[in-house]
Amino acid sequence: MNKCFRCQPRISLFQFSLPRCYAAVQPGCPPPQEKPVVGLPHKPDPKTVKCDYIGPPDAQSNLRPYVRHYGDEETRLARSLRLKRIEVEAWNTDFWTKHNKRFYEEKEDFIRLHKESGTSEVSADQMSHFYKAFLDKNWRIHIMYNISWYLKNFDILTLAAAVQLQRLLALAKRRS
């Protein structure tokens, strides 16, 4: 069931005191509830869905996969836009899959080395040093990713504008 945020009642947090629950288990907080996974067990066929399908997050990249709907009346320009979006999404998923794999491997190595040195648990302060070192080591990769991401999205925007212009011209032609 689709819910629109505008249709939801607005509740001010100042109206009543709500208990706060944090990531760590706090006394007096209810245990976290396991929510069932909602969605389809496999990707639907793009020709059978009525609109774009956004799936659950991918386990490796943490990105939500898209299935782009298209019909038989898709123009060449609309097809090139859809294929460009699919190409950029595949590139993005590939980047974040490799990045997250590298991050988790280095994080495990960091924790393992600290445990081998005699520390039973790694503190949040020690982990913050790892996070900063990881970001410092990969800043060039992140800059290049951002530049590539902006360029690819600019290409998508120009194609989307051309598709919309084509639709407007076709609509004007039908009305005249």
UniProtKB/Swiss-Prot annotation:
Pfam family, one: COA8
Compartment annotation: Mitochondrion inner membrane
The organelle targeting sequence, given as a residue range: 1-23
GO cellular component term, pick one: mitochondrial membrane
UniProt key word Mitochondrion: yes
A GO biological-process term: intrinsic apoptotic signaling pathway
Taxonomic superkingdom: Eukaryota
Sorted UniProt keywords: Membrane, Mitochondrion, Mitochondrion inner membrane, Transit peptide
Consequence of gene loss (knockout): (Microbial infection) After infection with E.chaffeensis, results in reduced bacterial replication rate and increased survival.
Membrane topology: Peripheral membrane protein
Entries under PANTHER family matching the protein: APOPTOGENIC PROTEIN 1, MITOCHONDRIAL, CYTOCHROME C OXIDASE ASSEMBLY FACTOR 8
Protein role: May be required for cytochrome c complex (COX) assembly and function, COX being the terminal component of the mitochondrial respiratory chain.
Similarity remark: Belongs to the COA8 family.
Protein name according to UniProt: COA8 family protein CG14806, mitochondrial
Lineage: Eukaryota, Metazoa, Ecdysozoa, Arthropoda, Hexapoda
UniProt gene name: coa8
